[in-house]
């Protein structure tokens, strides 16, 4: 997705930077902020699943994207962690009134994040993007909660904080060929057959020397 930094007026960028800095220094409870120095118009966050909900124990990564008309137009919100929720589409898009008709320029990003967290506590089946989840919420809450908790266990309980990071089992940097810590297999160990070869060479040299000495003796006669 293209950055909107160049499209936003300087005064808006200053306000966004100020608010993001404040959020990072003092985030709402259960929410972490991962600001990007390169693109302030795309804010990555993580939200802890609220206790007493099917999402408890999970950490859900999310991002807010500020368009070129922000703050006149609300930001767009996306869950990056897969979640079973009536108001979250299959591609992670979030449907909540504060990001649509109830948006006001003065609300700010903190209000948006708190509203999305509240959405995990009180889903709204009337504006469902995931119709299956919305139907189960209304007709069979036990099944809805079971499905939501299962996906939380699978996708949101990886033991990470939600921060973008490299996989622990990813490729590791190769050691330099001259690294003194790099151990060469077989280094310092006797090579099989070396002793035998040296012995054979020594015996050959002795036989050749004896033949030379014999020829010299015959010449003297």
From Swiss-Prot:
List the catalysed reactions.
S-ubiquitinyl-[E1 ubiquitin-activating enzyme]-L-cysteine + [E2 ubiquitin-conjugating enzyme]-L-cysteine = [E1 ubiquitin-activating enzyme]-L-cysteine + S-ubiquitinyl-[E2 ubiquitin-conjugating enzyme]-L-cysteine
On whether Isomerase is a keyword of this UniProt record, the answer is no
* Listed Low complexity bias regions: 193-206
* InterPro entries (alphabetical): Ub_conjugating_enzyme (IPR050113), UBQ-conjugat_E2_core (IPR000608), UBQ-conjugating_AS (IPR023313), UBQ-conjugating_enzyme/RWD (IPR016135)
Stretch list, region Disordered: 158-221
* Pathway as given in its UniProt record: Protein modification; protein ubiquitination
Write one Gene Ontology MF term.
ATP binding
Q: EC number(s) in its UniProt entry?
A: 2.3.2.23
Q: Give residue ranges for domain UBC core.
A: 11-157
Q: Where is the composition biased (Basic residues)?
A: 208-221
Keywords linked to the UniProt accession = ATP-binding, Cell cycle, Cell division, Nucleotide-binding, Transferase, Ubl conjugation pathway
Which is a Gene Ontology cellular component entry for this protein? Answer: nucleus
- Family assignment? Belongs to the ubiquitin-conjugating enzyme family.
What is the recorded function of this protein according to its Swiss-Prot or TrEMBL entry?
Answer: Catalyzes the covalent attachment of ubiquitin to other proteins. Acts as an essential factor of the anaphase promoting complex/cyclosome (APC/C), a cell cycle-regulated ubiquitin ligase that controls progression through mitosis. Acts by specifically elongating 'Lys-11'-linked polyubiquitin chains initiated by the E2 enzyme ube2c/ubch10 on APC/C substrates, enhancing the degradation of APC/C substrates by the proteasome and promoting mitotic exit.
The name under which this protein is listed is: Ubiquitin-conjugating enzyme E2 S
Q: Which organism is it from?
A: Danio rerio
């Amino acid at each position: 997705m293209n950055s909107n930094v160049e499209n936003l007026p300087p005064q808006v960028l200053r306000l966004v930077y100020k608010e993001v800095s404040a959020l990072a220094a003092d985030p709402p409870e259960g929410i972490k902020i991962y600001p990007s120095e390169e693109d302030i118009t795309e804010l990555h966050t993580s939200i802890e699943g609220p206790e007493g909900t099917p999402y408890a124990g999970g950490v859900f990564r999310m991002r807010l994207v500020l368009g070129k008309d922000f703050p006149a137009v609300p930001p767009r919100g996306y869950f990056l962690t897969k979640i079973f929720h009536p108001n979250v589409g299959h591609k992670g898009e979030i449907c909540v009134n504060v990001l649509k008709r109830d948006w006001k320029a003065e609300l700010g990003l903190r209000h948006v994040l708190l509203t999305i967290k509240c959405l995990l506590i009180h889903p709204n089946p009337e504006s469902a993007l995931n119709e299956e989840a919305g139907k189960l919420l209304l007709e069979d809450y036990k099944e809805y909660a079971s499905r939501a908790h299962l996906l939380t266990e699978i996708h949101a309980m990886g033991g990470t904080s939600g921060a973008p990071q490299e996989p622990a089992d990813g490729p590791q940097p190769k050691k330099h060929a001259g690294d003194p810590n790099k151990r060469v297999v077989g280094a310092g160990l006797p090579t099989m057959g070396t002793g035998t070869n040296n012995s054979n060479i020594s015996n050959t040299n002795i036989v050749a020397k004896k033949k030379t000495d014999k020829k010299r003796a015959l010449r003297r006669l």
